[in-house]
Amino acid sequence: VTAVRPGDRVAVNVETFCGRCFFCERGYVNNCTDPNGGWALGCRIDGGQAAFVRVPYANQGLTRIPEGVSDRKALLVGDVLATGFWAARIGEIHPGDTVMILGAGPTGLCTLLCDLLHAPGRVIVCEKDPQRRAFVRAFAPQALAVGPEEVVEAVRANSAHGGADAVFEV
């Protein structure tokens, strides 16, 4: 490992990837074809939540946590926020698009934040739990939070073509 040094605080990508296969070279590291690639940590390799873990291809999968960023804030970077960021990136959201997010748990909320960076025209969050819908309304008033029974009408009413341009099930 040459990208980090002993003692560095790092966030570990939830997926390991070789960086050289067809999919890695195109940015789709979740489809890495290497035997140690993909969802190795926590699946084929124990220790994803441990103090110490051996990370295959650590030069690609570790991100140094900057000084001044607390452990608490850095916690989201390794999985929940990274999932939302990646989803928004590969979802190809364009300004003015109608975006649908299915689920308003921690990953759904991070996806919402990252989707908003792309200036969609409308973001609709479908969540069955009324408390989570209320949180979305308070947290992101520009988003429309609806229950499953309202989702079809909400999408039709908020889209020029009757459907969502990007859908994220998180």
Indicate residue ranges for each PLM-predicted region:
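Glycine-rich beta-strand-centered segment in the early N-terminal region that forms part
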Residues: V1-C24, P66-G68
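Structured loop/turn residues at beta-strand edges in well-structured enzyme cores
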Residues: R5, G48, H94, H118, ...
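Conserved acidic residues
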Residues: D8, Q142-A143, D165
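Short, well-ordered coil/turn residues at beta-beta hairpins
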Residues: N13, F168-V170
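NAD(P)H dinucleotide-binding glycine-rich loop of Rossmann-like/cofactor-binding domains
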Residues: R20-L102
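Mid-domain Rossmann-like dinucleotide-binding core that forms the NAD(H)/NADP(H) cofactor-binding site
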Residues: R64-E149, E153
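Short amphipathic alpha-helix with an adjacent loop that forms part of the alpha/beta core around
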Residues: E150-G162
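Short SAM/SAH-binding signature in class I
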Residues: G162-F168
